[in-house]
Amino acid sequence: METKNLIRMANDIGSFFVSYPDEEQAKRDAAGHIQKFWGRDMRKQIKEYVNDTPEKNSQLNTFVFNAINEYLKD
């Protein structure tokens, strides 16, 4: 899948979870959603994007970037 599509999907997921009152729990839940519902190759691709792209240059919103960086398992 194209990375731009994964970015759009991840940002959509983040837009739901960002409204949670506990930001750390929201990030865990957003990453958990990706972990549960995305295939291994999709998870690997978005994780590589986060690892290879400085946050300031990322097309992911800050919340999603941090959720993936901090909580998404390989």
Where are these regions (language model features)?
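A domain-level signal for the structural core that forms small-molecule/cofactor-binding pockets
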Residues: 1-74
